[in-house]
Amino acid sequence: MSIIRNILLSAALFLFLSPANVNALSDAYKDNIYDAGPLKPVDSVLKVKPGQVAPDFTLKSLTGQKVTLSQYRGKKNVVLSFIPAAWTPVCSDQWPGYNIVKDLFDEHDAVLLGISVDSLPTLHSWTNQMGKLWFPVLSDFFPHGEVAAKFGILRSDGTAEGAIIIIDKQGLIRYIDVHDINRRPPLDSIVRELQKLRQG
C-alpha cells in the first residue's frame, strides 16, 4: 500500500512542479497576469519561530465566513500559504497546483488556508479565473496585512512574503519557509513536514 502511495505522491509532485501547470491556464487568464519582474527575494523579519504557539487570527473568506486559526486546535494540522499578490505569475501558478494534491492534505489530517493581503473582490475575480480551489481563501486586506505582520512576513511594499507555515493540532508552529518571492515553494518540503507530524 505504501508503495502505491509513494508512486501516486511522486506523480503528483511531478505534475505540481511541471511548467505544464502554467501552460494549461487559458490564454485569457494568462493575459490578466501582472509581471513586475524580479523582486527582492525576502523583505521582512520573522516574528515567530518553530515551537512557539502560532498567533491567532480571524479573517474573512471568499464565502463570507470568518475563519479563525484556533478553530482547528485539537482537530487539524494547518498549513498557511501566504502569497504576495493576486494576478501575479508565481501565485497564479502555486494555488491551482494544490488542487492536484488535495488527497495529500486529507491523508495527513491537514487543512490548507490560502492568505493574501488582497481585497475580497480582487481575490474573488482572480480565483474565479483560475478555477475552483478546494481550500479556504482568506483576505488579510483590512487592517492591511495585520496577520502577515503578526508573523513578521509583511514586506515594505505592503505585500506579504511567499511563505508556508505549518501548525500542528496543538497550535504550535512546526515549520516555516519564507521563500524567494520570485519562486514557488517546493511541495516536497510540505509533504516531508506533514509526514513528520503524522509520525509524531
Residue spans for each PLM region:
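Thiol-/selenol-based redox modules, centered on thioredoxin-like
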Residues: 159-200
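N-terminal targeting signals for export/organelle localization
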Residues: 2-60
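Structural micro-motif
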Residues: 134-135, 153-165
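Short acidic-hydrophobic, aromatic-tinged amphipathic segments that line or gate anion-handling sites
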Residues: 136-140
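Short active-site neighborhood of thiol/selenol oxidoreductases, capturing the structured segment around
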Residues: 68-98
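Structural microenvironment flanking redox-active thiols in thiol-disulfide oxidoreductases
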Residues: 92-133, 143-147
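Short loop/turn microsegments at loop-to-beta-strand junctions
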Residues: 54-55, 79, 161-163
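A short beta-strand-turn-helix
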Residues: 48, 57-78
